[in-house]
């Protein structure tokens, strides 16, 4: 079930935009342009319509959000029993391609994180073919004519 509309914040790159819920889930993204079909459309129904959630694995006691001054860089801070972690979301102005960047930054203590990526093209109607599920390298999700390359990494503090 989607979050109430007032719980969403906007990130964008002037050619596309995403809605990020207070729980760390991107529930809406038409990509690579505003007029493209959505690849995350949980806002229309449920997570099975596509979403990308990054959040603490433990119950959250407090959430605060803010935009960095004069930007669409969104910072969501989660407080849990064992610590504090920030999720920083943005879409940089594009060069050759569009990007969604999600950074997790530990602030205090140790916080176990969980990630769920459910790509669904055409507003949740098309389940893409994923060519790799390797945890340490890139993965590609394809459904002609759409495709998404997912890369990730863990940086030491």
How should these model regions be labeled?
Residues 2-157:
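Beta-sandwich/jelly-roll carbohydrate-recognition scaffolds of carbohydrate-active enzymes
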């Amino acid at each position: 079930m989607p979050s109430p509309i007032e719980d969403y914040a906007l990130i964008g790159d002037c050619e596309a935009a995403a809605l990020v819920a207070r729980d760390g889930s991107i529930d809406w993204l038409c990509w690579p342009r505003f007029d493209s079909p959505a690849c995350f459309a949980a806002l229309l129904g449920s997570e099975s319509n596509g979403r990308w959630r990054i959040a603490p694995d433990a119950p959250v006691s407090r959430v605060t959000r803010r935009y960095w001054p004069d930007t669409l860089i969104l910072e969501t801070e989660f407080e849990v029993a064992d610590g504090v972690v920030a999720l920083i979301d943005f879409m940089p102005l594009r060069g050759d391609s569009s990007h969604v960047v999600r950074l997790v930054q530990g602030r205090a203590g140790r916080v176990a994180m969980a990630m769920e990526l459910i790509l669904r093209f055409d507003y949740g109607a098309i389940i893409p073919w994923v060519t790799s599920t390797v945890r340490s390298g890139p993965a590609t999700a394809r459904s002609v004519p759409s495709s998404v390359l997912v890369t990730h990494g863990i940086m030491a503090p």
